[in-house]
Amino acid sequence: MQAAEPEKVTSAAESTEISTDKEKKEKVANDGDNYKKFRFGGYGEMVASFKDYGINRFYGAPEGNPDKHRNTISIPRFVLALDYKFNSKWILGAEIEFESGGTGTAYELENTENGEYETEVEKGGEVAIEQFHITRLIVPQFNIRAGHVIVPVGLTNAHHEPINFFGTYRPEGETTILPSTWHENGLEFFGSFGKGYASFDYQAMIVAGLNANGFDRNTWIASGKQGIFEEDNFTSPGYVARLDYKGVPGLRIGASFYYCADAGSNSDKADTYSSTGKIPVRIYTADAQYRNKYVIARANMVYGNLGNSAKLSEANTKLSNKSPYSRITPIAKNVVSYAAEAGLNISAFFKGNKKVPVIYPFARYEYYNPQEKGEASQIMEKRCQASMWTAGLNWYALPNLVVKADYTTRQIGTNKVFGTGKYNSENEFSIGIAYIGWFVKK
């Protein structure tokens, strides 16, 4: 969540967007964030889905996921947020996230017992500290933050609050191949520079790097985010950079880069990848958004490169079956995800009529493949590739409360924008509600 209040939304105005950080850079650096000492708030989302496919497309029938009608209902996220100002320059920020009811486990690696894995059920792995940091505001151009921070790689991580995407669920491509929400322990430098048509925001970070134990076939590096143990390995840090251009009213263009020199050196056991060689990870992303009172349009792409993927795949098949990792291989050398969505504000065409609700019909296309390309010796799994169309409605009952409904069709292994292939399509209708806001401020 960010420091600035949501803009007012009327029947003829655009809905607000919640920006990426705990503090919106321009306003926080000038201490213009509308609270004097502390504030408490949060965001959450609830979703029900009605599906015509089974739970696993990889096993069983050769045509992929079996035809099976099933329904689900969940609370994907409930997040509580707190900001506290020690003074105008030192700020404590925190968010606690409850996922899917807040149950789970944490793991310990017992080095005194031959490196066996043990679980601690009481830790609750699905109740997580999403953010916990101290910020030192210096000047608008340069500020420092230390602690547990959001890693803004990709559009969804940078703008992950539920009113910042049209669908009932977060965009599937990015959340399949990248951790979401991605948060790590580390140090961040951020600020704004330029003016007028040459205005930019930037973020630069050094954070705990990815753990290659968690890399697998279906989600690439998404399960390599650290945090399942009581301490994170910092042997090979992750280096993050993000730049956002905001010089044109209504337009934001962003790009981010992630680099970890050797994710294998962050593994649970130091000798797991001793014969593999270094396992470097590089992730490149670009995204854009344009909005005015009539339309909101977004687009994004992700490209990832993993070194020594064949040797890594072989090593990960030998991980302990007591470990929390999937051990499903092969792990791809390259992955790709790209998407675009657009929504139209119907109320903007009824100027002056405040009785017209703020409704955005929208459409979205996504392509993603965690098995885009392997090394010469690897055979990629075609059923990992998905081409998706989603269409639906967003009704902004309040400026920061939205009711969503959408229909999604997912084509598997086709490498086409339209059309079906040899595998069954996966279709679902979903309805949900999401909110964000500050409940108390002083």
Regions found by a protein language model. Give the residues of each.
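N-terminal periplasmic/intermembrane-space "pro-region" immediately following the signal or transit peptide
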Residues: 1-59, 442
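Outer-membrane beta-barrel pore domains
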Residues: 8, 14, 53-55, 67, ...
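Outer membrane beta-barrel
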Residues: 33-52, 67-212, 235-240, 244-252, ...
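Short glycine/proline- and charge-enriched loop/turn segments
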Residues: 58-64, 111-112, 163-171, 221-224, ...
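Active-site rim elements
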Residues: 121, 174-176, 226-230, 328
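Active-site glycine- and acidic-residue-rich loops that bind
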Residues: 180, 230-237, 276-280
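C-terminal ends of transmembrane alpha-helices
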Residues: 209-221
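Loop-centered beta-sheet repeat module
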Residues: 220-266
